[in-house]
Amino acid sequence: MANKRVFIAFAIEDEKYRVFLVGQAKHDNSPFEFIDMSVKQPWDTNWKTNCRARVKGCDGLVALISKNTANADGELWEVECAYEEGIPVMLMWINDERPALPSLLNDKRINIWSWPNLETFIGNL
């Protein structure tokens, strides 16, 4: 499978899960691989412009969903940006908690974090 460019959207409080996801993709037995295009450091005042350009340059976006997502304005903007740009989006729970969701995500399917789910999403990009 060729590497796909994947933007990872996450609440800053959930950064360790982004690290886990990137690590999973590098594991020898991983059924998927991708190039992490997430924003790892805060942008300057033009961050939305820079972020939109980065999202548009990706094959897909994986959003890590948690109790922190509802208050993660940056993450929600990144997900909304992907929807607006027609970039495929996979929403994925980071754990077993199922908190209230922001309206942007209310009618969306949220996947369980698993290798098969990631492999299917990334393989279909």
Task: List the predicted regions and their residue ranges.
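C-terminal helix of von Willebrand factor
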Residues: 113-125
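Conserved N-terminal substructure of TIR/SEFIR domains
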Residues: 1-57, 87, 94-95
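Structural motif corresponding to alpha-helix initiation and N-cap regions
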Residues: 45-48, 76, 115
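Inter-motif core of Ras-like GTPase G domains
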Residues: 60-63
